[in-house]
Amino acid sequence: MGTDAQVKRGSDVYSMQCAACHDAQLAGSGTAPALAGTDFAANWKDENVGSLFERIRATMPADNPGSLKRDQVADLIAFILNFNKYPTAQKELPTDFEALKAIKITAPK
């Protein structure tokens, strides 16, 4: 989900805004959940990308909630999903909540 360029931008956002708490490998820490692997899959199973987008947009980063721009959040989600083995696409993930809500988070193929 998301283009290669969007995943790269998301990786940059993650490194600057998220890795200190969630770990460089998205493994999480005592205070921040894992964003990869079985923990991520269990936490977001059968949810939609819109819910993930809104959670990140409204509550992250923890030291400055709501400070990320909508395009940064979409880029970040593209990176997180790609890290979790979701394939990239020809189109970028949108920043529109309704469009994102239609995308279910299921096990990658």
Model-derived features with residue positions:
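The canonical Cys-X-X-Cys-His
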Residues: G10, Y14-Q25, L76, I80
